[in-house]
Amino acid sequence: METKNENSDVSRAEEFKSQANEAFKGHKYSSAIDLYTKAIELNSNNAVYWANRAFAHTKLEEYGSAIQDASKAIEVDSRYSKGYYRRGAAYLAMGKFKDALKDFQQVKRLSPNDPDATRKLKECEKAVMKLKFEEAISVPVSERRSVAESIDFHTIGNKPRSSSMPTKTALAAVVAAVMVVAVRGFATTEILMVLVSVVLGTFWWGSFSGKVEPQYSGARIEGEEVTLDFVKTMMEDFKNQKTLHKRYAYQIVLQTRQILLALPSLVDISVPHGKHITVCGDVHGQFYDLLNIFELNGLPSEENPYLFNGDFVDRGSFSVEIILTLFAFKCMCPSSIYLARGNHESKSMNKIYGFEGEVRSKLSEKFVDLFAEVFCYLPLAHVINGKVFVVHGGLFSVDGVKLSDIRAIDRFCEPPEEGLMCELLWSDPQPLPGRGPSKRGVGLSFGGDVTKRFLQDNNLDLLVRSHEVKDEGYEVEHDGKLITVFSAPNYCDQMGNKGAFIRFEAPDMKPNIVTFSAVPHPDVKPMAYANNFLRMFN
C-alpha cells in the first residue's frame, strides 16, 4: 500500500516530467535532462522517465548516456518498447549497426503492428547488410594505395563528347594522313581506316587537353597558384549556390594534402608581438555562418590568421563549400589558416552524418575517398606561443602525457577507439574532479584537476577545445583554465545557441571572446545528405 508521501512523490515526478517535455519541445535539451533527472529522483521505477531522458541525451549527441538511460528503462520494464527504440537509435548514431539491429528486432517483437517500427527495422537491416558488404570487399590498410597519387588534375577538363578541339586542327591531321597515304600507297579500306583513326584520335587527345569547358562560368585557378581573387570568387559562387569545377576542386584538395603531409601531429604556432590569431570551433557545414565569421573578423591572411579546431563537416548541408573554402585559404597562404582534425573528420562519422552523401552528390565518388585520405593528414593539436594548447576534444585517461607524446602520435589513420589520438578528438570536461565515463560513449570525461596537472606538466597556461554546443557559443570552466568554443550558431537549425570565436593577441595571449548569431541560409535542411535511417530519428 502506497503512503501519502509516496503518492506525493509520484505526483511531483509527473509535474517535473511535464516541465521537461515542454523544455524538450523548445529544444532546451539540457534543461529537459535536469527536469527528467528530478522526476527520476522522485520515482526511479518509471521507465518513461529514463527513456525520455535518453532521447534528450541523444539530441545533445551524448550517446553513451543515452544508452545507459535506455538500458535502465529496459531494466525497469522489459516490455517497454520505447526503451529498446531509444537505445537502438543511440547505437545507430554511434555507427554500431549490429547492436542497433538487435534492439529494433526486439521493438518489432513487442510492437508487431507498428508500421514505424517495421520501417526502422528495415532501414537498420539495410545498414547492416551494407556494412557487411563493405567489410567483405575492403582492402587491408597495408595494401591500400593512395587515392591522391592516382589523380592528375591537369588532365581534368573537357569530356570527349564535348571536345572543343578546333576543327582546323583535325583537318590538318587529315591532310597529313592523306599525304602519307599518297606516298606509301594503301588500299581503299586501309585509307578509310587511317583517316577515321586520325580524326578520332585527334579529338580524343583534344578531350584530355585539360582545358576547362568554355561554358563553365565559375571561379578559375590560373596555373598552379591559388590566389585571393580566386578564393573570393569561389566563395561568392558558393554563396549563390554555384558549383566549383572538379578540376579546381581536385587541385585545391591535392595541394592541401601536400601541405598537411609535411606537418607534425602537434603544430607550434608563433604569433609575433602585437599580432593576433583567431581560434574558431566547430562549423559543421554551416557555410553561411562561416561567411559571417569572415565578415565580422576579416578574411584569413598572414596578418589575420585563423585556427579552425576541427569538425568542419557533417550535420550542416554545405560541408563541401566549407571544406573547399578552408582548404583554398590553406593553399593560398599556409600561415593564414591552421586546421585541426575533429572527430567528424573520419570515415565512420562522414558515412552517417551527411558529408559522404554530400560529396557524392556535389562532386563524385572519388572525392569521397580523397577527402577520407586527406583528413588523416590533419594535425591533431596546436600550441600557440608555447602557452595555449588547442585541441578538438580534450585530455587523457592517464596523467603525465607530454607534448612530445602528442608529437609522436602516428596520425595517418582513421581514429582508433582508444588511446591518445581517440581522447584528443573525443573527450569532454566535467565539473567534478578526476575522470569519469564519457557521456558520448567514446573517450572520457576529465575534471579541473586533470586540466591543471596537464597544463603544469607542459608549462602551458590555457586549454582551448571545441566539440560541444554551448548556449553562448563558449564556456569557461576549470577555474578559467579551459575554454570551450563552438562556432556553429543555431546548430542544426534548432538549438538556438550563439556561435563564438576567440582572438588571442601577443604577447599576453589573453582570450578575447566574440559571440555572434546565426544568419539566414538557403532552404536546405541540415542532414539533407545524411543516411536515411539516421534522418528518421532526428
Swiss-Prot record:
Enzyme Commission (EC) number: 3.1.3.16
Transmembrane segment boundaries: 163-183, 185-205
Cofactor(s), names only, from the UniProt record: Mn(2+)
Superkingdom of this protein's organism: Eukaryota
Gene3D superfamilies to which the protein is assigned, alphabetical: 3.60.21.10, Tetratricopeptide repeat domain
GO molecular function: metal ion binding; phosphoprotein phosphatase activity; protein serine/threonine phosphatase activity; tetrapyrrole binding
Keyword Nucleus: yes
One Pfam family, short name: PPP5
Active site per database record: 344 (proton donor)
Stored PROSITE patterns: TPR (PS50005), TPR_REGION (PS50293)
Positions bound to Mn(2+) 2: 311, 343, 392, 467
Coiled coil: none
One CC-aspect GO term: cytoplasm
Gene Ontology terms: biological process: chloroplast-nucleus signaling pathway; negative regulation of chlorophyll biosynthetic process; nucleocytoplasmic transport; red or far-red light signaling pathway
UniProt TPR repeat ranges: 13-46, 48-80, 81-114
Database matches in CDD domains: MPP_PP5_C (cd07417)
Functional summary from the UniProt entry: Isoform 2 dephosphorylates phosphorylated phytochromes, with a preference toward Pfr forms, and enhances phytochrome-mediated photoresponses, probably by enhancing their stability and their binding affinity for light signal transducers such as NDPK2. Can use para-nitrophenylphosphate (pNPP) as substrate.
Annotated protein name in UniProt: Serine/threonine-protein phosphatase 5
Name of the coding gene: PAPP5
